[in-house]
Amino acid sequence: MSCFPVLFVMMLLVSQSVWAFPGPETRDGSVQDAESRRVRSAEEDCCENPVCKHTPGCPKGS
């Protein structure tokens, strides 16, 4: 049971690195633009949510 938080943090780090370094299949311009727009809108929705607006992706002013 004590290793569960460590695994959870590792999963978060892996998911962050996946978003930060997209694979070669996302290098197509239109696909990458669509992905970035979708991610940006998801981040904006999250930043408007008082529960998770403190996440690192949100601007500090909000």
From Swiss-Prot:
It is found in: Secreted. Residues 22-38 form a propeptide. Disulfide bonds: none annotated. Its main location: secreted. Contains 2 disulfide bonds. One of its GO terms (cellular component) is extracellular region. Keywords: Cleavage on pair of basic residues, Disulfide bond, Secreted, Signal, Toxin. One of its GO terms (molecular function) is toxin activity. Residues 1-21 form the signal peptide. Expressed by the venom duct. Belongs to the teretoxin A (TA) superfamily. This is Teretoxin Tan1.1. It comes from Terebra anilis.
